Amino acid sequence: HIVIYNKGYSSNTLMLLSKLSHKYNIKLMDVRQVSSFKLGDSSFLFFDSFIPNSRDKNEYSIITMIAYQNKKVLLMGDASKNNESLLLKKYNLPEIDILKVGHHGSKTSSSKEFIEMIKPKISLISSGKNNMYHLPNIEVVKRLQGIRSRIYNSQQNGQVTIDLDDNLKVDSNSYGNASGL
């Protein structure tokens, strides 16, 4: 199965995805028809926080919460502050164990209100070294530091592995500063 948000794609792209999924016997599902599913001991919840008719395709990101053994992981995709605001209005969000920081740590995501509500223990930022957008944004990093989130950035930490069975033990293939930013 592949879960997508249909409105995030042009009709030509949707047609191509449909043909490919049929060819390879993969079920293609719109996220608005799924909302959640279980896989073994894990449950996946898709939040309806899409911004209708937005010109910013990032606002069509699928935001997913994974729950496993009393741990909560929130995957933000490239969601914007507008998506975060909608999440805060529509849902009673819990505190999060692990946050995959939205939009590579861009200033268009990770609002103060959102970060203070979910209080992630660990924040993961995926951004390339010396990237042209100078990500992650320093204000986003300071916001996360302000709530004492342990920050791991792929620029310094490389591949990060978190053991969900072992009280969130973190291992990384560090390129530099192993403690995060």
Where are these regions (language model features)?
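Non-globular, low-confidence helical/coil segments that flank catalytic cores
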Residues: H1-L181
